[in-house]
């Protein structure tokens, strides 16, 4: 499956898209798998399982800021996990919430419309709801 363009310079994909990054011209990769693949371009690795008990929330503020700063600097960013369905979708939804001031539901629908196969696990949905509360209470939007 090809990586999916979500907004200008932000793509959601799977591990194969990371491996073949040169085919797509990515400048930065956010890797959300258990494997610390070095792609030869700037890569951020968050070692996390696709499990309802995995803590992705503690990374959301930092990784959404990183995505925002990268895009602002004109970089083409790929966010990927193994299949491009749960972990990477969660991070991209969080970024859309923060950058567009969307609710969790609106951000989920926005990303789902672009990449119909997304399906964050129930634990990640709860963490996105927590992230939404943090955004609303701190006004920490871009």
UniProtKB/Swiss-Prot annotation:
Recite the UniProt keywords alphabetically: Hydrolase, Protein phosphatase
Looking at the Swiss-Prot or TrEMBL record, what is one Pfam family this protein matches? DSPc
Q: Which GO terms describe its molecular function?
A: MAP kinase tyrosine phosphatase activity; MAP kinase tyrosine/serine/threonine phosphatase activity; protein tyrosine/threonine phosphatase activity
Q: What is this protein called?
A: Putative tyrosine phosphatase 123R
State the EC number(s): 3.1.3.-
- Tell me which family the UniProt entry assigns to this protein: Belongs to the protein-tyrosine phosphatase family.
The Tyrosine-protein phosphatase domain covers: 2-137
């Amino acid at each position: 499956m090809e990586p999916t363009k979500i907004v200008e310079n932000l793509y959601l994909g799977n591990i194969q898209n990371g491996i073949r990054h040169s085919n797509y011209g990515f400048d930065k990769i956010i890797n959300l798998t258990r494997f610390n693949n070095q792609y030869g371009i700037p890569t951020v690795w968050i070692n996390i399982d696709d499990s309802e008990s995995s803590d992705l929330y503690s990374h959301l503020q930092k990784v959404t800021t990183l995505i925002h700063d990268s895009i602002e600097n004109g970089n083409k960013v790929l966010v990927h996990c193994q299949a491009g369905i749960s972990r990477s979708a969660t991070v991209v939804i969080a970024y859309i919430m923060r950058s567009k001031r969307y609710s969790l539901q609106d951000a989920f629908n926005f990303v789902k419309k672009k990449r119909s196969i997304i399906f964050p696990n129930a634990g990640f949905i709860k963490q996105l709801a927590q992230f939404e509360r943090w955004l609303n209470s701190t006004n920490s939007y871009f």
